């Protein structure tokens, strides 16, 4: 079973500056029996990230479109190529 997790846009998935969602995702994924098939998508400027299958999304800066939409559109493109059995979204009710 492949699982994809999309963190909130401004959430850092880094041990040096992690938010509550990152800590929760890190702690639960580390003990999951699916941890090898779980991919975490997020946006951080920190080079040191938690030691899991993390994919950093760096949206293009476009003054005519929000970075949140760029961020989600990148995730959707990735999902169309590499489909997941389960998608977990955190803190983005407007999507």
Label each residue range with its predicted role.
Residues 71-75:
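Functional cleft and adjacent loop/helix regions within the main domain
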Residues 19-20:
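Glycine-centered tight-turn and secondary-structure capping sites
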Residues 7-15, 24-70, 93-94:
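N-terminal strand-loop element at the rim of the active site
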Residues 1-4:
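Extreme N-terminal starter segment of soluble prokaryotic enzymes
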Residues 76-94:
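Short N-terminal targeting/anchoring amphipathic segment
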């Amino acid at each position: 079973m492949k699982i994809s997790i999309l963190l909130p846009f401004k959430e850092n998935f880094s041990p040096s500056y992690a938010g509550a969602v990152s800590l929760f995702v890190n702690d639960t994924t580390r003990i999951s029996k699916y941890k090898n098939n779980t991919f975490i998508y997020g946006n951080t400027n920190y080079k040191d990230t938690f030691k899991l299958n993390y994919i950093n999304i760096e949206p293009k800066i476009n003054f005519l479109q929000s970075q949140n939409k760029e961020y989600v559109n990148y995730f959707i493109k990735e999902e169309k190529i590499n489909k997941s059995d389960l998608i977990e979204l955190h803190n983005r009710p407007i999507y």
